Amino acid sequence: MNTLFIHPFFPQKSLFKAYDIRGDVTLFTNDFVWSLARVFAEVFVYAHQTAKTPTLAVNKPTVVIGYDARHQSQEIAKYMAYACQQAGLVVQWLGLTTTPMMAFMAQQFSGNGLMVTASHSQKHINGIKWLINHESPSGDDVQQLYEALIGYKAIVPDDGLIDAIRQTTYTTPKDFFATYIQAIEQAFTHINQAKLTQTTYFHAPQQIVIDCMHGATSDFAEALFSQLGYCCIMLNASPDGNFPQGNPDPTQSNRLTQLAQTVK
């Protein structure tokens, strides 16, 4: 009698979307996350070996890793970082950050980066976005990642491995937020020059209301826009994975009510 084998990670197939990994956090089990981390490590190593352009970290395959404010994101990011380090990659640890900041910092190194985030999804959802040699994955790339994943035997990390994953520390790029702000300032200057205008954000400070929706931008938005010359009124500007005001999704009209009332 033939027995049908179903891989332990078959339930996780639904996480692999068109352009990222995303779904209910209960599917991000320890054995799945650890196996996925090892697959990502292999992908990043291969990306370095086959890169067509030289990297700033010469002869040092590098990956930039960050995470959002969701409760499980830091833990998942640590799994990713540990597997990458064990594979010989240099991990540039951004900690709590935003996806654009991760992408910017990846560009400063080898073009390889990973962000544990579910963007504007509900709090019980988590996910992963990534860059390989400066490019986001295609739908085929995402599915190939899953095919590589099911080639791994599901191994539940033991206590020793989990302790190592949680306790290992990594290099954080020096002054990376200041570097990010400087790049945005240069972009604003270029835009103003292109418009041939005498009025820049430095000459005409304006008031701006920013609703961080308790996401990762809470740690960065005020500093960024203040540097650009704005007087900031901050709403919900503390990272909180419970998202007490509701889903961090600005496309939901009810999530803009507080912002609209403050602007008035």
Regions found by a protein language model. Name each.
Residues 5, 126-263:
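Gly/Ser/Thr-enriched, mixed-charge loops and adjacent short helices
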